[in-house]
A protein has these predicted regions:
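Glycine/serine-rich anion-binding loops at beta->alpha junctions
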Residues: 17, 45-64
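Structural signal for hydrophobic packing residues in well-ordered secondary-structure cores
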Residues: 13-16, 27, 31, 49, ...
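Polybasic, low-complexity association/targeting segments
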Residues: 1-15
Length: 153
C-alpha cells in the first residue's frame, strides 16, 4: 500500500496537479475525502504557497496530512496543539534532511531577484528535467507513509 500511495502522488503531479495537491490527494480516501475535495483544499499551497516560492508545496501537503492525523479540534486543547506542532516540526526536519531545504525557492535554486508570477510553467519534458518537484512530491509521500507505518496505521 505504501508504494501505491507514493506512486499515486507522483502520477498526480505528472498529470499536471500541483505538488501540494499531489501529496494530499494520494491519501484522500484514507481521511474520508473525495479526490476532488482533496485537490481543492490543497490547491493554494503549490509553488511554495500560491507560487510565492515559500514553504515547498509538497511539504505543505505533508503538513496538511499531519493536521488530518493529529490536529486538535478543541480550541483549549493545548496538549493536542503541541503534539501537532511537534509532529510538523519532526516532518519538516526529515524533509530538510532528505532534500536540503524546506523553502521552494531554495529547492529550485532561484534567486531572490526573480519576480513572483502567478502563471505556472507548461509541464514539458524540459520542465521535469530542470525541477526537483517530482522528487519533493515523492519524498513527502514517502515520509508520510513511513510515519503511518511507524504508528501502525
Amino acid at each position: 500500500m505504501e508504494n501505491e500511495r507514493i506512486e499515486k502522488a507522483v502520477e498526480l503531479f505528472k498529470e499536471g496537479f500541483k505538488c501540494s495537491q499531489s501529496v494530499v490527494a494520494a491519501f484522500a480516501d484514507k481521511y474520508g475525502f473525495t479526490r476532488e475535495q482533496a485537490l481543492r483544499m490543497s490547491a493554494s499551497f503549490g509553488g511554495g504557497i500560491g507560487r510565492m516560492r515559500e514553504t515547498c508545496g509538497a511539504a505543505c501537503g505533508l503538513f496538511m496530512l499531519a493536521g488530518l492525523e493529529t490536529g486538535s479540534t478543541e480550541g483549549a486543547d493545548s496538549k493536542g496543539k503541541a503534539a501537532n506542532y511537534a509532529l510538523v516540526q519532526e516532518l519538516a526536519e526529515e524533509f530538510k534532511q532528505r532534500n536540503g531545504a524546506l523553502r521552494c525557492a531554495d529547492l529550485l535554486g532561484l534567486s531572490k531577484k526573480e519576480p513572483i508570477v502567478s502563471t505556472p510553467e507548461a509541464r514539458t519534458n524540459q520542465y521535469y528535467a530542470k525541477r526537483p518537484c517530482v522528487k519533493m512530491v515523492e519524498e513527502a509521500a514517502r515520509i508520510w507513509c513511513e510515519y503511518l507505518e511507524k504508528q501502525g496505521k
